[in-house]
Amino acid sequence: NLHLNDNGFTYFYDDDWDKTQAAFRLESETFPGLTARDGSYSKDDFRDFQRYALSRGVEVIPEIDVPAHSLAFTRFRPSIGSTPEEYGKDHLNIMAEETYGFLDSLFTEYLAGPDPVFVGSRFNIGTDEYSNRDSVVVEKFRYFTDRYIRFAEKYGKTAMVWGSLTHAKGQQPVKVDGVEMIVWSNGFANPQEMHDLGYKMVSMPDQILYIVPHAGYYHDYLDTRDIYDTWAPHDFRGFTF
């Protein structure tokens, strides 16, 4: 899973959104100026990278993480972002039609055509850590998730998501069949609940497998011996399937 966009936490940057690091690291001809200047993939380089990996039996799964983790997009186009008073500038405004038009165009740039930029069979649309402030937000988030699952599938991709449907429980249906969910935090996606809904799950428990150097809340390095001795992928931190 290759994360093509993200941003830092404001508390590492004097609680100032304008100072907070953010980047989108893939060439975009649809939105010139969106791509980070301090390191990025060209479209051709990214195609070549994925094909090389496939030739070695590895599928690179591209991820564009929305509607949270999106400061690179809201900095490029502030009109699609939430305000700091709402959720934070790293949240897209999922109530605004302009947001959907922007993402439709961006995703289409990489999914469409005879030689799409995203080469493999999967595309990760993100969907982790968005606000669940009230039922209106939750239901719109669930709509957003379902919409972009189906958008990915329209281009022949298996849609992947970061599990968030325990955090965002609601009534709006979210597609299950054919969707692959990364279960990373039991508070965001309870493994038993997701299993009962019928999702195909990928076990990636954050407290065991995440490396975020110097952050203080995840590992600086992985204890590979401990992981080998005490954990197996079917163990979702207390839920074993």
Regions found by a protein language model. Name each.
Residues 2, 182-183:
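Redox-cofactor binding/interface segments in oxidoreductases and associated redox assembly factors
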Residues 159-166:
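Surface-exposed extracellular loop regions of Gram-negative outer-membrane beta-barrel proteins
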